[in-house]
C-alpha cells in the first residue's frame, strides 16, 4: 500500500504522475525482494516544508530533494534482502496486514530544479529520487564510498529496468 499525500501547491500533481511514481516504488520493492504486503507513505512538499523537516529531523537548515524515514532497523552494511529473507518481523512492524517500511518526503519543487540542472526530465528526476529514497527505507546508505557505489548501482539498475533514462 502506498499512501500519497500532496502537501504543496506550487507544482501540479496529476493522477498520471502519481500512478507512475507508485509503479516505480512497487517495482523497486519487488526488485529488492520485498515479497510481503507493505506500506510506504509518499509525501509531496515544497522547498520550504522540506527545509523545515530537514532542520527538525537532521538539524540541517536548508532545503533538500528527498528525505527518507525508515521504520525497520538494519545491521550495518546490510539491506532488506540480506536481513529479512525469512520475513521475521514483530507485530509492531505492521499496520494491519502491511509491513510499515517508512516515509518518503519529496520536494517536487527541488525535483524540478534538479531536472533542469541535470538536463533530464522532471519525471526522470522524481523517479530517481523515489528509488533513492525507497532504497534508504530498505537499508541502503551512501555515507561511505563503498556503500555509495553499491547504492548508485542499484538505483541505475532499477531505473534502467523501468526504461527511465537520463
From Swiss-Prot:
GO terms for biological process: rRNA processing. Its EC number is 3.1.-.-. PROSITE patterns: UPF0054. Its cofactor is Zn(2+). SUPFAM superfamilies: Metalloproteases ('zincins'), catalytic domain. The keyword Hydrolase applies. Single strand-specific metallo-endoribonuclease involved in late-stage 70S ribosome quality control and in maturation of the 3' terminus of the 16S rRNA. This is Endoribonuclease YbeY. It comes from Clostridium botulinum (strain Eklund 17B / Type B). The lineage of its organism: Bacteria, Bacillati, Bacillota, Clostridia, Eubacteriales. The gene is ybeY.
Amino acid at each position: 500500500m502506498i499512501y500519497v499525500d500532496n502537501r504543496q501547491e506550487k507544482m501540479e500533481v496529476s493522477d498520471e504522475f502519481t500512478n507512475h511514481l507508485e509503479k516505480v516504488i512497487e517495482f523497486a520493492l519487488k526488485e529488492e525482494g520485498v515479497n510481503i504486503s507493505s506500506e510506504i507513505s509518499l509525501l509531496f512538499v515544497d522547498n520550504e516544508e522540506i527545509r523545515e523537516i530537514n532542520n527538525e529531523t537532521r538539524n540541517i537548515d536548508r532545503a533538500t530533494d528527498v528525505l527518507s524515514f525508515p521504520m525497520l532497523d538494519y545491521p550495518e552494511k546490510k539491506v532488506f534482502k540480506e536481513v529479512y529473507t525469512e520475513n521475521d518481523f514483530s507485530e509492531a512492524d505492521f499496520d494491519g496486514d502491511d509491513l510499515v517500511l517508512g516515509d518518503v518526503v519529496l520536494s517536487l519543487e527541488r525535483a524540478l530544479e534538479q531536472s533542469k540542472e541535470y538536463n533530464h526530465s522532471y519525471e526522470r528526476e522524481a523517479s530517481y529520487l523515489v528509488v533513492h529514497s525507497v532504497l534508504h527505507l530498505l537499508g541502503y546508505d551512501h555515507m561511505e564510498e563503498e556503500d555509495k557505489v553499491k547504492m548508485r548501482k542499484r538505483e541505475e539498475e532499477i531505473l534502467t529496468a523501468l526504461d527511465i533514462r537520463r
